[in-house]
Amino acid sequence: MYFYKKYLHFFFVVSKFKFFLKMQVPFGCNMKGLGVLLGLFSLILAQQLPDLPRTQHPPKRELKYWCTYVPQCDFCWDCQNGICKNKIMETQLIDSNHSIVNCRVSRNSETQTCFYEISSKMPNHFSMSCSHPTPYIGNEIFMKKVGGDYMTLLTLKQYCLYFIISIAFAGCFVYAVRKNLRLNTTIKLLTLLSILVYLAQPVLNRPLSIFYTKQFLPRTYTPPTRELDYWCTYAKHCDFCWECRKGICKNKVLDDMPPFIIQNDYINKCSIARYFDRCMYFIEPKIPYIHYMNCSLPTYYG
């Protein structure tokens, strides 16, 4: 329901935008209207996703699914009889086989921190910073885990691109003022530039969606063998995970897959991407056969 409201709000703004284009008003008022439109667009982009809910005491039959939710904070607990073992990272301040009574994990979207309770007697909470998995860009040389210099390089690339975009927008505005262009022509120029900026998002490894600007969900390609667990952790954002061995991809999360693909079907590319609320993976030899699956956040345990 949350995302449906955002879509309805977006289409309402678009309809008002089309109506505004047909109006012929003085140039001074046009600039005010343009400012209002840009403000509405910024408001849409600034909308926050809802906080990720707390998970607590998953039943044994749901352990895989609960563990699927936890990797959004880059760690995953395999909980059996009160013993939680970290399946992703070994170099933590807490022992991998430490007894965690409650196995409780929560995420605060404002502070970007995760908490899990070590003992029910003292409540001792350990805070861990959350970060999104480093994207794979298709070349094994550039594949690094979180903590390397890749994110810094990506941030610099973003700043450079945004600086160029700012200059382009300012240039369009100055050109429109000097030439005394009508509002219709001015907005067409800015709209064209906005479309170009929107299509340039894959350069920054970001999804083509204004509703997921707060998430870093880049495209993943075939990972090296040593990175399979980490790549599989990222793929679980779409509620399925492929264990790829020599081109054979086995689904580790869901057994009741649609009839379009068999659990042990041969998938040559083993690539997963997320656009809007869908994931896709490529199947051989039916090129370019693409099967779409709806994405959703795992159900939490209250």
UniProtKB/Swiss-Prot annotation:
Entry keyword Transmembrane helix: yes
- Keywords of this entry: Glycoprotein, Host membrane, Membrane, Transmembrane, Transmembrane helix
Q: In the UniProt record, does the keyword Aminoacyl-tRNA synthetase occur?
A: no
Which InterPro entries does the UniProt entry name for this protein?
ASFV_fam_110
Q: Which Gene Ontology terms of cellular component type are present?
A: host cell membrane; membrane
Highest taxon above the source species = Viruses
Q: Which residues cross the membrane?
A: 26-46, 154-174, 183-203
**Localization (cell):** Host membrane
Glycosylation sites (chain numbering): 97, 294
Membrane topology field: Multi-pass membrane protein
Family that this chain belongs to: Belongs to the asfivirus MGF 110 family.
Function recorded in the entry = Plays a role in virus cell tropism, and may be required for efficient virus replication in macrophages.
List the protein's name: Protein MGF 110-11L
